[in-house]
Amino acid sequence: MAKGQSLQDPFLNALRRERIPVSIYLVNGIKLQGQIESFDQFVILLKNTVNQMVYKHAISTVVPARPVSHHSGDRPASDRPAEKSEE
């Protein structure tokens, strides 16, 4: 798994699992809204009145309608508190 996926996948999976409504802003400024039905390495399937397959390279920002619960196991090591070193 690529390093960039270590934060992206747990975040998108939490949005999908908890059925949190999202606003997805594309690089051209268009705003899409719905719930994440599914995703893979390249696309997100967004469900609203219709299903839309959105290519990740076209996405600028994903904004959840409410806070997403984070589990410590989902956080990459770079986001965990640093261990104190003995000096």
From Swiss-Prot:
Q: What happens when the gene is disrupted?
A: A hfq deletion mutant cannot colonize the murine small intestine despite retaining the ability to produce the colonization factor TCP. Deletion of hfq does not impair production of the sigma factor RpoS. Expression and activity of the sigma factor sigma-E are dramatically increased in the hfq mutant.
Query: Quick one: where's region Disordered?
Result: 65-87
Q: Does the record's keyword annotation contain RNA-binding?
A: yes
Q: Which GO terms describe its cellular component?
A: cytosol
Top-rank lineage group of the source organism: Bacteria
Please verify whether the record's keywords include RNA-binding: yes
Q: What Gene3D superfamilies does the database record attribute to this sequence?
A: 2.30.30.100
State the UniProt keywords alphabetically: RNA-binding, Stress response, Virulence
For this protein, the record's InterPro entries field holds: Hfq, LSM_dom_sf, Sm
Q: Where is the Sm domain?
A: 9-68
| Matching CDD domains | Hfq
> What PROSITE patterns does the record tag this protein with?
SM (PS52002)
Basic and acidic residues composition bias: which ranges?
71-87
GO MF assignments: RNA binding
A Gene Ontology annotation in the biological process aspect, one of them, is: regulation of DNA-templated transcription
Q: Cross-referenced NCBIfam families, in alphabetical order?
A: Hfq, PRK00395.1
Which family is annotated? Answer: Belongs to the Hfq family.
Per the entry, what this protein does is: RNA chaperone that binds small regulatory RNA (sRNAs) and mRNAs to facilitate mRNA translational regulation in response to envelope stress, environmental stress and changes in metabolite concentrations. Also binds with high specificity to tRNAs. Essential for virulence in the suckling mouse model of cholera pathogenesis.
| Protein name per UniProt | RNA-binding protein Hfq
Task: Give the source species.
Answer: Vibrio cholerae serotype O1 (strain ATCC 39315 / El Tor Inaba N16961)
